[in-house]
């Protein structure tokens, strides 16, 4: 599940660093609509671009990815690897190395990062602020409730309010690194549960490492 730490996921009334900041009710209304629109889809297919930049270190990388989500099940293709999960286990498929790693998802861990809660990671742990708006595109700034516990300063969401969808997520790191997810396509998907079941016969020449 570490891949989703890239792929970054009520409000405190008394904070030290942000003691004078309160969440914007208007921002919460918009985010609630995004959550409702996402929950209304039985399955979702997302095509995205991930960008990592750090001008101080002269770093500029980008990768394309695809993610299909159905409840807690998902299929991911990103950064030269694939992942598959049935909601209880996750298979990481390293095609170049002909290796497959199997890990168990800790369902009792409230902080476990899964695709279903990744799309709504902003619901807890943040203060919300409205920023610029151009047409239907609204920027909402997320400030962490506990800044000392995270390695970033803030997250900016770009939301298309006409369809209640996130179009862009940008994280500003404390080390001057910026991580950005650009959503190129976000649409309902029709997919059977069988698509999320790992079939060992499809990978006869692969080494399987069971970490459960």
Segments predicted by a language model, with ranges:
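N-terminal leader/targeting segments and the immediate start of mature chains
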Residues: 15-59, 72-73, 202, 207-212
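An acidic-aromatic
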Residues: 64-112, 179
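Bacterial Sec-dependent N-terminal signal peptides
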Residues: 1-23
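Flexible, surface-exposed loop/linker segments and immediately adjacent secondary-structure boundaries
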Residues: 105-135
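Gly/Pro-enriched, hydrophobic low-complexity segments
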Residues: 126, 135-212
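Extracytoplasmic
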Residues: 41-43, 62-64, 71, 85, ...
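Beta-turn initiation residues at beta-strand->coil junctions
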Residues: 52, 81, 94-95, 170-173
């Amino acid at each position: 599940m570490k891949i989703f730490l890239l792929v970054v996921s009520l409000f405190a009334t008394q904070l030290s660093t942000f003691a004078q900041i309160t969440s914007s009710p208007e921002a919460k209304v918009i985010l609630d609509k995004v959550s409702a629109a996402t929950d209304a889809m039985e399955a979702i297919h997302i095509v995205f671009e991930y960008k990592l930049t750090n001008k101080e270190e002269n770093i500029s990388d980008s990768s394309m990815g695809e993610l299909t989500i159905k409840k807690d099940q998902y299929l991911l293709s990103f950064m030269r690897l694939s992942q598959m999960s049935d909601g209880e286990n996750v298979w990481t498929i390293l095609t170049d190395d002909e290796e497959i790693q199997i890990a168990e998802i800790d369902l009792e861990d409230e902080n476990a990062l899964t695709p279903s809660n990744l799309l709504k990671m902003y619901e807890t742990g943040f203060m919300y602020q409205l920023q610029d708006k151009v047409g239907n595109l609204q920027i909402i700034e997320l400030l962490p409730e506990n800044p000392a516990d995270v390695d970033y300063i803030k997250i900016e969401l770009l939301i298309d309010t006409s369809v209640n969808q996130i179009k862009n997520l940008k994280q500003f790191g404390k080390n001057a690194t910026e991580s950005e997810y650009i959503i190129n396509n976000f649409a309902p998907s029709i997919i059977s549960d069988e698509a999320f079941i790992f079939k060992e016969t499809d990978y006869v020449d692969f080494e399987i490492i069971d970490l459960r």
